[in-house]
Amino acid sequence: MDIKEQGVEAYDEVTAGGVQSHTGAGQLYLCATPIGNLEDITFRVLRILKEADVIAAEDTRNSIKLLNHFEISTPMTSYHEYNKYDKAKVLVEKMLKGMSVAVITDAGTPGISDPGEELVRQALASGIKVSSIPGAAACITALTMSGQATR
Protein backbone atom coordinates (compact mmCIF):
# COMPACT_ATOMS: atom_id res chain seq x y z
CA MET A 1 0.00 0.00 0.00
CA ASP A 2 1.46 3.35 -0.96
CA ILE A 3 1.30 6.47 1.18
CA LYS A 4 -1.60 7.97 -0.78
CA GLU A 5 -3.70 4.83 -0.20
CA GLN A 6 -3.04 5.09 3.54
CA GLY A 7 -4.61 8.55 3.66
CA VAL A 8 -1.37 10.47 4.04
CA GLU A 9 -0.80 13.61 2.06
CA ALA A 10 2.20 15.87 2.31
CA TYR A 11 0.01 18.91 1.71
CA ASP A 12 -3.65 19.15 2.63
CA GLU A 13 -6.31 21.53 1.44
CA VAL A 14 -6.88 24.51 3.68
CA THR A 15 -9.46 26.94 2.42
CA ALA A 16 -10.38 30.43 3.47
CA GLY A 17 -13.37 28.85 5.21
CA GLY A 18 -11.17 26.74 7.43
CA VAL A 19 -9.68 23.32 7.71
CA GLN A 20 -11.31 21.03 5.16
CA SER A 21 -11.87 17.30 5.68
CA HIS A 22 -12.63 15.01 2.76
CA THR A 23 -14.04 12.05 4.69
CA GLY A 24 -16.60 13.47 7.09
CA ALA A 25 -14.28 12.33 9.85
CA GLY A 26 -11.94 14.86 11.34
CA GLN A 27 -8.35 15.21 10.35
CA LEU A 28 -4.92 15.02 11.93
CA TYR A 29 -2.39 17.78 11.23
CA LEU A 30 1.28 17.37 12.16
CA CYS A 31 2.38 20.99 12.49
CA ALA A 32 6.05 21.92 12.46
CA THR A 33 6.98 24.52 15.05
CA PRO A 34 9.99 26.87 15.13
CA ILE A 35 13.32 25.40 16.21
CA GLY A 36 14.64 28.59 17.75
CA ASN A 37 12.86 31.76 16.71
CA LEU A 38 9.07 31.99 17.07
CA GLU A 39 8.91 34.06 13.87
CA ASP A 40 10.07 31.05 11.84
CA ILE A 41 6.59 29.51 12.02
CA THR A 42 4.64 29.38 8.75
CA PHE A 43 1.40 31.23 8.04
CA ARG A 44 -0.17 27.88 7.20
CA VAL A 45 0.69 26.37 10.59
CA LEU A 46 -0.70 29.45 12.33
CA ARG A 47 -3.96 29.18 10.39
CA ILE A 48 -4.35 25.49 11.19
CA LEU A 49 -3.57 26.05 14.88
CA LYS A 50 -6.28 28.73 14.99
CA GLU A 51 -8.86 26.66 13.12
CA ALA A 52 -8.30 23.21 14.62
CA ASP A 53 -10.72 21.97 17.25
CA VAL A 54 -7.92 20.96 19.60
CA ILE A 55 -4.13 21.22 19.75
CA ALA A 56 -2.23 18.22 21.11
CA ALA A 57 1.04 19.54 22.53
CA GLU A 58 4.18 17.74 23.68
CA ASP A 59 4.59 20.12 26.61
CA THR A 60 1.70 22.48 27.26
CA ARG A 61 3.94 24.70 29.40
CA ASN A 62 6.19 25.39 26.39
CA SER A 63 3.44 25.44 23.79
CA ILE A 64 1.39 28.05 25.64
CA LYS A 65 4.21 30.54 24.98
CA LEU A 66 3.88 29.94 21.23
CA LEU A 67 0.09 30.11 21.31
CA ASN A 68 0.03 33.26 23.43
CA HIS A 69 2.63 34.96 21.21
CA PHE A 70 0.36 34.48 18.17
CA GLU A 71 -2.90 35.02 20.10
CA ILE A 72 -4.17 31.49 19.45
CA SER A 73 -6.94 30.42 21.80
CA THR A 74 -7.62 26.90 20.51
CA PRO A 75 -8.07 24.41 23.38
CA MET A 76 -4.88 22.47 24.13
CA THR A 77 -4.27 19.02 25.57
CA SER A 78 -1.06 17.20 26.42
CA TYR A 79 0.30 14.50 24.11
CA HIS A 80 3.72 13.24 25.13
CA GLU A 81 5.90 10.16 25.51
CA TYR A 82 4.24 9.10 28.76
CA ASN A 83 0.58 9.32 27.67
CA LYS A 84 0.86 8.76 23.92
CA TYR A 85 -1.00 5.43 23.75
CA ASP A 86 -4.00 6.39 25.87
CA LYS A 87 -4.19 9.96 24.58
CA ALA A 88 -3.97 8.77 20.96
CA LYS A 89 -7.12 6.70 21.51
CA VAL A 90 -8.94 9.72 22.94
CA LEU A 91 -7.83 11.97 20.07
CA VAL A 92 -8.76 9.40 17.41
CA GLU A 93 -12.26 9.19 18.93
CA LYS A 94 -12.54 12.98 18.65
CA MET A 95 -11.45 12.86 15.00
CA LEU A 96 -13.91 10.07 14.23
CA LYS A 97 -16.61 12.45 15.51
CA GLY A 98 -15.47 15.10 13.02
CA MET A 99 -13.00 17.13 15.06
CA SER A 100 -9.65 18.26 13.67
CA VAL A 101 -6.52 17.79 15.77
CA ALA A 102 -3.27 19.71 15.30
CA VAL A 103 -0.17 18.15 16.90
CA ILE A 104 2.79 20.30 17.91
CA THR A 105 6.04 19.58 19.70
CA ASP A 106 8.39 21.84 21.61
CA ALA A 107 10.44 22.46 18.45
CA GLY A 108 10.38 20.88 15.01
CA THR A 109 8.09 18.33 13.42
CA PRO A 110 5.94 15.87 15.37
CA GLY A 111 7.16 12.31 14.91
CA ILE A 112 10.81 13.27 14.36
CA SER A 113 12.49 12.59 17.71
CA ASP A 114 9.22 13.74 19.31
CA PRO A 115 5.81 12.20 20.00
CA GLY A 116 3.56 11.76 17.00
CA GLU A 117 4.09 8.35 15.44
CA GLU A 118 1.60 6.49 17.68
CA LEU A 119 -1.15 9.00 16.97
CA VAL A 120 -0.42 8.82 13.23
CA ARG A 121 -0.50 5.01 13.37
CA GLN A 122 -3.87 4.95 15.16
CA ALA A 123 -5.34 7.66 12.93
CA LEU A 124 -4.37 5.81 9.75
CA ALA A 125 -5.72 2.54 11.12
CA SER A 126 -9.03 4.34 11.72
CA GLY A 127 -9.18 5.80 8.21
CA ILE A 128 -8.48 9.37 9.30
CA LYS A 129 -6.68 11.68 6.90
CA VAL A 130 -3.22 12.73 8.11
CA SER A 131 -1.40 15.80 6.81
CA SER A 132 2.10 17.01 7.58
CA ILE A 133 2.48 20.78 7.54
CA PRO A 134 6.15 21.61 6.92
CA GLY A 135 8.24 24.21 8.64
CA ALA A 136 11.70 24.73 10.01
CA ALA A 137 13.92 21.63 9.92
CA ALA A 138 17.06 21.23 12.01
CA CYS A 139 18.72 18.96 9.45
CA ILE A 140 18.34 21.51 6.63
CA THR A 141 19.49 24.34 8.88
CA ALA A 142 22.57 22.33 9.90
CA LEU A 143 23.35 21.44 6.28
CA THR A 144 23.10 25.02 5.02
CA MET A 145 25.28 26.26 7.90
CA SER A 146 27.95 23.59 7.29
CA GLY A 147 29.42 25.04 4.12
CA GLN A 148 29.26 21.57 2.54
CA ALA A 149 28.36 21.15 -1.12
CA THR A 150 24.69 20.23 -1.57
CA ARG A 151 24.61 19.54 -5.29
Regions found by a protein language model. Give the residues of each.
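Loop/turn-to-beta-strand initiation segments
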Residues: 26-28, 98-102
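Structural motif
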Residues: 58, 79, 104-106, 131-133
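Glycine-rich, highly charged phosphate/nucleotide-binding loops
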Residues: 83-91
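Short glycine-rich anion-binding loops that position phosphate/pyrophosphate groups of nucleotides
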Residues: 35-38, 106-110
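Acidic, metal-coordinating catalytic cores used for nucleic-acid/nucleotide bond scission
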Residues: 83, 107-115
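Class I SAM-dependent methyltransferase SAM-binding "motif I" and its flanking Rossmann-like core
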Residues: 118-151
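Alpha-helix capping/helix-boundary segments
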Residues: 61-63, 108-109, 138
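Glycine-rich, flexible N-terminal cofactor/catalytic loop recognition
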Residues: 2-82
